[in-house]
Amino acid sequence: MRILKSHPLLKLVNSYLIDASQPSNISYLWNFGSLLLLCLIIQIITGVTLAMHYSPNVLEAFNSIEHIMRDVNNGWLVRYLHSNTASAFFFLVYLHIGRGMYYGSYRAPRTLVWAIGTVILIVMIVTAFLGYVLPYGQMSLWGATVITNLVSAIPWIGQDIVEFIWGGFSVNNATLNRFFALHYLLPFILVALVLMHLIALHDTAGSSNPLGISGNYDRITFAPYYLFKDLITIFIFIFVLSSFVFFMSNVLGDSENYIMANPMQTPAAIVPEWYLLPFYAILRSIPNKLLGVIAMFAAILAIMLLPITDLGRSKGLQFRPLSKFAFWVFVVNFLILMKLGACHVETPFIELGQLSTALYFGHFIIIVPIISLIENTLVDLNTMSKG
């Protein structure tokens, strides 16, 4: 045990994973961190393995994926692990963010942790988009064309930037090469950001807790208590992920991507992966191209407003019934946006998308501050009546 506290590197591991004191009342909703770390490890291992057999060339990319599936030993397993863990990664990240919103994890002194987490989400979205292009099926090509074309909405220089990204006048060999290089690089940047996220959490106030009060009254060490608690959810996660990988490998994908990319034939509907659909729905709900792009990016950055707009006196929504109701309305609205992102651009989906987009932004800018002020006033009135 002594070496864990004296060795310069093991000392860090000890302070984060063994002796780190945690509030004694944190629930299973605080287990997402370990699950997300497991997802990142799986993604890097499977991604590097896939990169050994992948060819970033427009003529060979699709066939190299088929080669991985058919000829490489357990290549099908590595590929399906990579694609399904990507979905699991985003699913858990959304739950992690939702838990943070519900329990007020964005409030001081954890604002820096929240800000770094938002940057992690942005890097994840970019990485996922780049990875979706690499198989070079129909949805890969047209998804890349549509999303990169959004940059052309920037006044004056937009089209030049798009051609710079493409390395030509359309998605071509240069595009695929640079997307592959960036997709390989970004997960390692993600690792650095995750370490920053952990350091910011560890060096401020540590984990919050379901009551929203100081956790200093009763704390226990991370090992063995929370280590074993994390292992329970890790085993459940492995079981669920395995059921997807082995029995429902393509249920979260798009069948269009099993058709080789054809620049001469547009798919019936161009949709991204399910985890990017809410932001895609926001993009499509605004007719103006530039405003749509701004709204899409603003939708991701909107969670950064919470430390400013939440004016409530108590941390978290556990004892704030109005805020709790508003939060669940927001969750349902987010799921509606996800569904609308996969629908065709036609009535009534356009109007529903516009309403949902207005409600999405309204939650952060109007609903959260107004409800928190109403709750503060009700608490004050109750205190005065009792006084």
From Swiss-Prot:
A ubiquinone binds at residue 202. Heme b b562 binds at residues 82, 183. CDD domains: cytochrome_b_C (cd00290), Cytochrome_b_N (cd00284). It is a multi-pass membrane protein. It is found in: Mitochondrion inner membrane. Its main location: mitochondrion. It comes from the Eukaryota. Heme 1 (or BL or b562) is low-potential and absorbs at about 562 nm, and heme 2 (or BH or b566) is high-potential and absorbs at about 566 nm. PANTHER family: CYTOCHROME B (PTHR19271:SF16). This is Cytochrome b. It comes from Podospora anserina (strain S / ATCC MYA-4624 / DSM 980 / FGSC 10383). The gene is COB.
